[in-house]
Amino acid sequence: MEEKFNNATPQRPAGSRALDGQMVPVDLPNFIKEIKNETSYHENGKNAITVFKSEHTTLTLVALKKGEKIQSGTEEGHLLMNLYVIEGDLSFSAKEKEQYLSVGQLLNYHYDYPFQAIAHAECVCLLTVIK
């Protein structure tokens, strides 16, 4: 298996890290601190970092301030998505259905319709998308 790495960027000069490989450890508490301390979180109310990415699976750590949201994009071909709440709470809605999620709860969603998730308080979640 070929390992894949993310290169450092001006926003994350120490950001070189493995994204895919036989075994990829992910230090979630460290990444949470990192994305909450970056300028984009303070200026935009949200920030995210991809912590794993393979051909079929992407894991993204997302931090949201109260009232901020994440929503489906224009991507197609997603089969399943998981949203795990690490801190805070949020509401997830899709096609007239809404589900409240709090710390430690996991939502599995078959990607049939557009969705959005709105934070009720500062929130951190792990978003897994499977294609």
Predicted regions: what is each one?
Residues 95-111:
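Short acidic-glycine-tyrosine-enriched beta hairpin
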Residues 1-56:
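A short, N-terminal "cap"/entry segment at the start of jelly-roll beta-barrel domains
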Residues 69-71, 88-93:
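Short beta-strand segments in beta-sandwich/barrel cores
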Residues 77-91:
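Glycine- and acidic-residue-biased ligand/ion/polar-headgroup-sensing regions
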Residues 111-131:
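Ligand-binding loop in jelly-roll beta-barrel domains
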Residues 86-87, 102-103, 121:
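A cytosolic small-molecule/anion-sensing beta-strand core signal
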Residues 43-48, 60-76:
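Conserved short histidine dyad/triad with adjacent acidic residue
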